[in-house]
Swiss-Prot record:
SUPFAM superfamilies on file: Ligand-binding domain in the NO signalling and Golgi transport (SSF111126)
Compartments, record wording: Golgi apparatus, cis-Golgi network; Endoplasmic reticulum; Cell membrane; Host membrane
Topology of this chain in the membrane: Peripheral membrane protein
Pfam families (UniProt xref): TRAPP (PF04051)
Quaternary structure and interacting proteins, as annotated: Part of the multisubunit TRAPP (transport protein particle) complex.
Additional free-text comment from the UniProt record: Blood stage antigen transported to the erythrocyte surface.
BP terms from Gene Ontology: endoplasmic reticulum to Golgi vesicle-mediated transport
Name by which UniProt lists this protein: Trafficking protein particle complex subunit 5
Function, as annotated: May play a role in vesicular transport from endoplasmic reticulum to Golgi.
Organism from which the protein derives: Plasmodium falciparum
Length: 184
């Protein structure tokens, strides 16, 4: 008798990861709607999206480390390279650019010319400029913190036309993280 494996029995690294763009946009718009609802009770929309992203980042760290069969990174450049290449490709189907700040040894940036998170969301004008890329900033912060690289992560988006968004994920590591790396 030929038994095929159920989806639960398949290895994690063999399951196809594709999600349709329409399903993603509906799910993400519902997340934004939920944050809009919470904002009416005095909670900032970006903070709500960032908090949701934190939870995703923690879980994504465990999953991608196992899936890609890589050792956990022990220095800042390696973890940021992993995020800008592998994590970004897993989430958004393309890699992003990693930049180091010229002003501070604690600051790095991940730049994405056209992030999906800002593409399909129309926020009412009375809410001002809401940056939905705060969700991606939360994912990066969760990923870093679960790897013991504590940092504050924020998202900044510049609109460069109708459908073009230049998003920068700004990462500022805590001084003790940079000092720990210097001592090793």
């Amino acid at each position: 008798m030929d038994k095929s494996k159920s989806s639960i029995e398949k290895e994690l690294n063999r399951i196809k990861q594709d999600v349709s763009l329409s399903a993603f946009s509906i799910l993400f718009s519902e997340m934004v709607q939920y944050c809009l609802y919470k904002s009416k009770r005095g909670y900032r929309i970006e903070d709500c999206l960032h908090e949701m992203g934190l939870r995703v980042g923690y879980k994504l760290n465990e999953y991608l480390t196992y899936k890609n069969k890589v050792k956990r990174s022990i220095n800042i450049i390696n973890i940021l390279t992993f995020i800008s290449k592998h994590v970004w490709k897993y989430l958004f189907q393309h890699s992003s650019d990693l930049l180091k700040s010229q002003d501070s040894i604690y600051e790095y940036m991940i730049c994405d010319k056209n992030i999906l998170l800002n593409k399909f969301i129309n926020v009412p004008k009375d809410y001002g400029n809401i940056n939905c890329a705060a969700f991606a900033a939360g994912i990066v912060e969760g990923f870093l913190c679960s790897s013991e690289f504590q940092a504050d992560v924020t998202a900044h988006t510049i609109h460069e036309g109708d459908d073009n968004y230049n998003t920068t994920i700004f990462i500022k590591f805590y001084p003790e993280v940079v000092e720990r790396e210097k001592n090793h």
